[in-house]
Amino acid sequence: MDVSGLTSIEQTALLTEYCRATDSRAVHPILGDHRAAATVAQIDYDFTTLAATPSVVPLVALRAKMLDERIRGFIAEHPDAVVVDLGAGFNSAVLRIDPPSGVDWYSVDLPAVIATRQALLPTHDHPVPASLLEPGWTDAIPADRPTMVFADGLVAFLDESDVIAILRRVTGHFASGVIAFNDYGPVSRLNRLVGRVATARKTNSPHDQWNFAGFKDARRPESWNPDLALLEEASVMQRPEAALFPGGLRLAGRLSHRVPAIARKARILQYRF
C-alpha cells in the first residue's frame, strides 16, 4: 500500500508500528505482535529511513505491552467500558486485547491515517477521523460509561498547551475513567538536539517532530487539570523484560533502580478522573 501521501507528522505512526513488527521477529519478543509484522508487510515504504534503533524497538514494544495490561485490567473491572485510543496510528491493540462485545473501542487519528488504518487492519473498532487539536473529536464517543483513554507515542509530538487542552477535553466530556500514556520525563532542548544529531542520517526521525518538553514530577498534570488524580507511575526501565534489552539499555535498566532520573526516561503514567 502506498503511504507516500502521508505528511511527516502522520508518518510517525509508521515508526511505532515498524518497531512492534521488528520486536515480533525477535528470538525472544517482548510484545510479540505478529499483526504488526503483517501490517508492515503490506506497506510500500522504505522503513530503513526510520530511526528504529536496537534500543528504540524494545522500549516501544514494552510500553505497548504495559499499556495493554492496564487496558485489560480496566476492561476486567468494567465489561461495558469505552476504550479510546488517541493517535491510534496503525496500533493493533484492539486485536491484541480482543475486548468482549460489551466494550466499545474508538480509534482517533488524523483522517489520512484513519483511512490507511482501515485499509490495513481487520478491526471492529469505531474509527474517529479527526484532529485531537480540534474540539469536536469527542462528539461521537459515548460520555456516560466507564472510559479508558490511552495514548501510545503521541504526547511527545504535541506542545504542552495541546496536551493540557486534550486532557481537559477528556475530563470535560467523559463522566469517569482513567487516562494512560507513555512519557519520557523532562526533555530539554539539548536532549532534543542530541536526538536529532544522533539520527541525522535518517530522513524520517521522530526527533524532528518532537515538541513536548515533558516534566519530572508525575503529579504535574494535576496542576493543569483539577479533575485528574495520579493513579500510577510505572517505569518501563524497571520491568523484568528489561533483561531482554541490548547491552547499554540493559545497563540503564539496572541503574534505574538507583537513579530516579533514568527510571523517568521511559514510564507509563495513569490518572483517574
Describe the predicted segments one by one.
Residues 148, 172-187:
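Conserved beta-strand signature within the Rossmann-like core of class I S-adenosyl-L-methionine
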